[in-house]
Swiss-Prot record:
Gene this protein is translated from: 2
Keyword tags: ATP-binding, Endonuclease, Host cytoplasm, Hydrolase, Magnesium, Metal-binding, Nuclease, Nucleotide-binding, Viral genome packaging, Viral release from host cell
Gene Ontology CC terms: host cell cytoplasm; viral terminase, large subunit
Cofactor(s) in the UniProt record: Mg(2+)
Catalytic activity from the UniProt record: Endonucleolytic cleavage of DNA to give specific double-stranded fragments with terminal 5'-phosphates
Annotated site (ATP-binding): Y46
Protein name: Terminase, large subunit
Residues where ATP binds: G491, A492, S493, V494, Y495, G496, K497, P498
Residue ranges of the region described as Endonuclease: 401-587
Location of the motif Walker A motif: 76-83
EC number of this enzyme: 3.1.21.4, 3.6.4.-
């Protein structure tokens, strides 16, 4: 006979068993989950076994798994563990968050290889994943080279990105692009891979787009394009072990007072020279555990990808989109000595140098000196506008070039994908310090333009060059029109400078004096001007178009836009690449640079998203008027009176 105590014990056990199904797992961050559950398979890992997240990987992985961040871009070199990070994040989404995922490789064959050599061994070696894969190791409809369907109902697809059909029908929560720079920029003439792929997550409650790649050619690189769409470009800053000052690691060169240095013909002597106080840092001394990711555009920073802070240290919400850059010098999987050997080998061959820049530095390769661009290339881009502002344009910026006897202003319209349309050219003759001249500049800044949809547009942001005149003139006009609308700028002809750097605070004159990286901007814009023309009715990212109006654009303006060429010059005993106008007039080019800088600062500082703005504008123009709504209620033709 069962005693009352035993009955009670049996009942308690039964209740406990029944309640197990109601237990909700404690939520884990991506890094917490990976450190607890993730294992590296021996087939594709230098160090198989339990995963341990590296300091620089923490922020990246947690951002990838952060539901409040929609888009994560990673510009990377080789040997930083990106593929393993991506697999760990995918496993986290599948097992911990029960999210459907779609991962794109550049081709179908690459996708199959990835599934066989990376995904399947990961499922086998990660117990939490294997538990969800009862079909593992045998033929099953849920176990194919394109789809893994887990017992939880969650699906993981791995497809090639070269066929447009692979971007259709799937509805997922997470879409990833591995080696995005190897994708075709236009998938079977249906659009960019990220544009097509990100359509698959639009219905998700927590949509996530992860893009990662070693970069390729500057100006045409897919990961560079993706990164430029984000307002936040993060670099990993680590403290100097001697002076404590933070800095992100740079390769440097012979002329740089920082970066990797070594004795001639002795790669083993390599050390890092601190850019703040010239401290000598050896690789074994560098402690990355106190590093933090800092945005070079906004000053925003994070240590862990979970909590974000402003440059002043105030906690702020996570960004909608974020870009990271990481390169080989941070990796424990190689040595600085090997980086030097790779560099010396690369110097022997131009192709090797390109490979070094892409795969070791994680930077885009800038095509060097080329022939001067023929202005006829731009004349071939002349198209007929249906209005002063073409239909696809959603944002206007202007650049003003200051001369001693005039101001020249060019107005540019921008469409999604940074498609550019020249809208207007205004030359204001007169002394720059005379009020009458400046009043005409005021009128030009406030001029209204008729859009193809019938509405009026004004210039949203202006970059006004202070070179050649008293800067106070521009400062006063900036305050008159709004210190955020009219930005005084000065050029910085130094390679590697951002297109525009806006200070966090006003200067002593009460305005934001911005620095424009003219060489960087010209590199970008010349690459776009060289591109083959496309039909005006075909939206083309980065295309540059000119109006069929000789008052605005003629051979004169075309010649000014191509006035400069990239030349090699010896400076201080070192060969440098410089933009040289050969004393040709180049005002149109300068104004385009400033107008483009105005666009870029709008993206970086005010999170301008041309695609979102276009969608908003489309919804606004298609919304029925009160008159049309009244007609619909009264039974007009097709709901509206005509």
């Amino acid at each position: 006979m069962i005693s009352d105590a035993q009955k009670a014990a049996n009942a308690a056990g039964a209740i406990a068993t029944g309640l197990l199904s109601l237990i909700i797992p404690v939520p884990l961050t991506t890094v917490q989950w990976a450190n607890k559950h993730y294992y590296l398979p021996k087939e594709s890992s230098y160090t198989p076994g339990r995963w341990e997240t590296l300091p620089f990987q923490v922020g990246i992985m947690n951002c990838m798994g952060n539901d409040l961040i929609r888009t994560v871009n990673l510009i990377k070199s080789a040997r930083v563990g990106y593929t393993k990070m991506l697999l760990g994040v995918e496993a986290y989404f599948i097992e911990h968050k029960s999210r459907n995922s779609l991962l794109f490789q550049p081709t179908d064959s690459a996708a199959e290889d990835f599934m066989k050599s990376h995904v399947e061994p990961t499922i086998r070696d990660v117990p939490a994943m294997l538990e969800l894969a009862p079909w593992f190791g045998r033929k099953h409809r849920d176990n194919t080279l394109t789809l893994k369907r887990f017992s939880s109902g969650v699906g993981f697809w791995c497809l090639g990105g070269a066929a447009a059909k692979n971007y259709r029908e799937k509805s997922v929560d997470v879409v990833c692009y591995d080696e995005l720079s190897s994708f075709e920029p236009d998938v079977e003439k249906e659009g960019s891979p990220t544009l097509l792929g990100d359509k698959r997550i639009e219905g998700s409650v927590w949509p996530k787009s992860i893009r990662g790649s070693t970069p390729k050619i500057k100006g045409s690189c897919q990961i560079e394009k993706a990164a430029n769409e984000s307002a936040h470009f993060m670099r990993f800053y680590v403290p100097c072990p001697h002076c404590g000052e933070e800095q992100y690691l740079k390769f440097g060169d012979d002329a740089s007072p920082f970066g990797l240095k070594w004795e001639k013909n002795k790669p083993e002597s390599v050390f890092y020279l601190c850019e703040h106080h010239g401290c000598v840092i050896h690789q074994s001394e560098l402690d990355q555990s106190n590093g933090r990711w800092i945005c070079e555009n906004t000053g925003m920073w994070t240590r862990d990808g979970l909590m974000f802070f402003s440059a002043r240290g105030d906690e702020i919400p996570p960004p909608r989109s974020i870009t990271f850059h990481i390169w080989t010098a941070y990796s424990p999987f190689t040595t600085w000595v090997q980086i030097v050997y790779d560099w010396l080998d690369a110097l022997k061959d131009p192709n090797g140098l390109k490979t070094f820049v892409n795969t070791t530095l994680g930077e885009t390769w800038e095509e060097a000196v080329g022939e001067k661009l023929d202005h006829q290339v731009l004349m071939d881009k002349v198209v007929r506008y249906t209005a002063a502002v073409p239909a696809r344009v959603v944002y206007l910026t202007a650049g003003i070039d200051s001369q001693r006897n005039r101001f020249e202003m060019y107005v540019w319209g921008w469409a999604p994908g940074e498609e550019a349309f020249l809208v207007d050219k205004i030359i204001i003759m007169g002394r720059p310090d005379e009020e009458e001249t400046l009043l005409r500049v005021d009128a030009a800044i406030n001029k209204k333009y008729r859009h193809a949809d019938g509405t009026e547009m004004t210039i949203s942001r202006v970059c006004w060059d202070i070179g050649g005149i008293d800067g106070e003139i521009v400062y006063q006009r900036s305050k008159k029109h709004g210190v955020f609308r009219v930005l005084p700028v000065k050029g910085a002809s130094v390679y590697g400078k951002p297109v525009i750097t806006m200070p966090k605070t006003r200067n002593q004159r009460g305005v934001y004096l911005c620095e424009v990286g003219t060489d960087t901007a010209k590199e970008i814009l010349y690459a776009r001007m060289k591109a083959d023309p496309t039909p005006v009715d075909e939206a083309t990212s980065y295309a540059i178009r000119f109006p069929d109006d000789p008052e605005i654009f003629s051979q004169t303006e075309a010649q000014q836009l191509v006035a400069e060429e990239l030349v090699e010059k010896w400076e201080k005993g070192k060969m440098r690449l410089l933009w040289d106008n050969k004393k040709r007039r180049n005002e149109a080019l300068d104004c385009l640079v400033y107008a483009y800088a105005a666009l870029r600062v709008s993206v970086q500082r005010w999170q301008l998203d041309l695609a979102v703005l276009a969608k908003s504008r489309e919804e606004e123009t298609t919304r029925p008027t009160l008159k049309e709504l009244a007609a619909k209620l009264s039974g007009g033709v097709n709901g509206y009176s005509r």
